[in-house]
Design a protein with these regions (language model features):
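Generic structural detector for well-ordered beta-strands
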Residues: 34-38, 88-90, 137
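Short, electropositive, low-hydrophobicity segments enriched in small/polar residues
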Residues: 50, 73, 150
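Hydrophobic beta-strand-centered segment that forms part of the acyl-chain substrate-binding groove
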Residues: 64-116, 131
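Catalytic strand-loop segment that frames the active site of acyl-thioester-processing enzymes
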Residues: 10-67
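Glycine-rich, flexible loop/turn motifs
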Residues: 38-44, 79, 137, 147, ...
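HotDog/MaoC-like acyl-thioester-processing domains
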Residues: 4-33, 94-100, 108-166
Length: 166
């Protein structure tokens, strides 16, 4: 048990479980991964390049999907996958080489038909500052034709929206 104010919270290992929230996440228990900004991530201004943030968002999105049992092997078996239709990103603060970042993601909306919105938040671990907020609209497509396809029941069951705010 870990102390949490006057209450005791159980220590759990599942990435989507409820636990004390030391960083200021927008939702109680996002799926998270940690990355460190390296010099390869920097642009001419000396901070992490905007394109690198998009790569990190893709990385944490796949990590989350895999944790839900939907890796690309599942997509192939089901003949369906999710592709990005729209990104909305707000860059709130710069990050630099050596900064440790926590990448957080969760499903914000899912119509259980063709589309879902995945939300993201990147928090700098050193000071707890949110450096990026964003979301991506994903569309379910047939892997052979590339045309929109109704979400298989496995997608509907796994990609459930988080409804409670932190």
């Amino acid at each position: 048990m870990q102390p949490f104010g006057k209450w005791q919270m159980p220590t759990v290992s599942h990435p989507m479980s409820t636990r004390p929230n030391p960083l200021a996440w927008d939702v109680p228990a996002p799926f998270t991964e940690r990355v460190t900004v390296s010099v390869e991530h920097l642009d001419q201004f000396g901070h992490a390049n905007n394109v690198q943030y998009l790569r990190w968002l893709e990385q944490v999105a796949w990590g989350h999907s895999i944790s839900l049992g939907l890796g690309f092997d599942s997509y192939e078996r089901l003949g369906a996958g999710c592709v990005a239709r729209r990104h909305e990103l707000d860059y709130l603060a710069a990050t630099f080489a050596g900064d440790e970042l926590m990448l957080g993601t969760w499903i914000q909306e899912c119509d259980a038909k063709f589309t879902m919105w995945r939300a993201y938040q990147i928090v700098r671990a050193g000071d707890g500052k949110t450096v990026l907020r964003g979301r991506t609209q994903w569309v379910c497509v047939d892997l052979k034709s590339g045309r929109p396809k109704r979400m298989p029941p496995e997608f509907v069951g796994a990609y459930k929206p988080v409804t409670m705010l932190a």
